[in-house]
Amino acid sequence: SVLGGFLLSNERREKQALREQPRELSQKLGQAIDGIASTSPLTVVDVGAQSLEDEDHVYAPMLAHTKGRVIGFEPLEHRRREREANERNIDLSLRPTLIGDGRSYTFHINNIDATSSLLPFNRDIVDDLNDHRTLETVATETVVTTTLDEAISDVSRVDFLKLDIQGFAYPALANAASVLSRTLVVHCEVEFLPFYLGQALFSDVDPLLRANGFRFVDFSRLSRSAFRSGPPASRDQLGWAEAVYFKEADTITNPSWILIQAFIAVTIYGKLSLARHLIGEYDRRSGTSYESLFDD
């Protein structure tokens, strides 16, 4: 119908505007942040920092719009060398440190590098799922972990903390109270099934981060698998996700930190209403009028 076509056309225009506005806002907010000496450069801490073949680093858009640096932790040497060779254009410091709770563990190096972990596979779970049953450990070594509080004690503010450490996020976060107190956004892989023996699940990580002053915002990615009996296209089991947390604004005393959160909300996640909400709080505290950018 004519009305249906009109409504569909409006919907398309709105969606197009939503796609375009984050790019413009990212540029303007990035310039604003670069102009505040106390906030620039922004700091990304990447725990589990190897590059993945099929995707960019989640924080790449952030580094494209403002000055930033990356402090990464990646235990596999060939993965560190690979990333250093491919990303010479950014301020990147990669360290071999294994982040954890400060104790000794057996590091399980698996046939798929990205699944290597301080914990062994839980074969009862892994063998049941079509996408996971070929995973296996090919080597082990004894290692000593370091807490985040120890590893980055000299970093005054963490703007974006990303963790992808295969079942070990909870111990890493539980021993990072000082770092979390000065972190603005956490992007963390969480599991809903125990792929690794002894691992904590999302239901454990969520209250830990809330207790440290963070609000759960969204899952930026959800991964589902089919059971091995098939059919493979029937991905019926939710296995893991990437969870996004923002430090509650009422716990932040420095207004510029809220401006950084707004920049991350729009630049990495495309969350315009969240960004505008945060900008409104920043304007209220700082006497600025950045919220007007959303009306352009």
Tell me the role of every PLM-derived stretch.
Residues 1-4:
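Long, low-complexity intrinsically disordered regions enriched in Ser/Thr/Asp/Glu with frequent Gly/Pro
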Residues 6, 10-296:
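Phosphate/nucleotide-binding beta-alpha loop and adjacent structural elements of enzyme active sites
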